[in-house]
Amino acid sequence: LIDAGKKGLGPSTAQSQINDMIVEYGLAGEQVVRPKGGDPTLFARLDEEIAALEGAGVNWNIGPGITAASAASAAIGQSLTERGRNSSVRFMTGHDMKGFAEHDWRELAKPGAVASVYMGKRSARFVQGRMLMYGAARDVPITVIENATRPDQRVVTTRLDRFSQDLEDAQLTGAALTIIGLKPRAAQSLVSEAKQDVVELA
């Protein structure tokens, strides 16, 4: 077992090193399993690893997983889509290779819009500012789920106008997913069932 994990804003294994390792062991005839913390097809650098394997002539396949947005929404007792509320949901990253990621903020600011922001802790103030700039209501619910579905899961519930400050105050250190437009439906039952921390800041 080789630890090749990544930690946002912390020590991480370089992607090039991961590519080299899976190619090296694959060429040596080993059966290599590259586990991901979610679904490997979403914000997981899958294409880079496939390109390295194909370049070396190593066969590969993909085992689908459950993406963090689905796990996190289930953990707070919510559905990502609801008839009459939203007919679509966005999976978006808080930042890209150029910095904070730009999105269709006008659509995200519309009533009923739901979005899941991956790797978004550092971009909270940016997302907040953009949505307010494009006319989003100040009381849009926002939920941040740290370590979704794990025993050490924490949930921060807030609203758009207090989003960045409340997130900073919560001092989350683990991997977190932000859901815009939804708040926990069953926080109290989740506390008893999963022994999670619920930080109510709204």
Give the location of each predicted region.
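Class I S-adenosyl-L-methionine
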Residues: 1-63, 164, 176
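Active-site donor-binding loop signature of nucleotide-sugar glycosyltransferases
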Residues: 4-6, 93-94, 147
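A contiguous loop/helix-start segment that scaffolds small-molecule binding in enzyme catalytic cores
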Residues: 17, 27-33, 45, 49, ...
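Class I SAM-dependent methyltransferase SAM-binding "motif I" and its flanking Rossmann-like core
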Residues: 37-111, 154-157
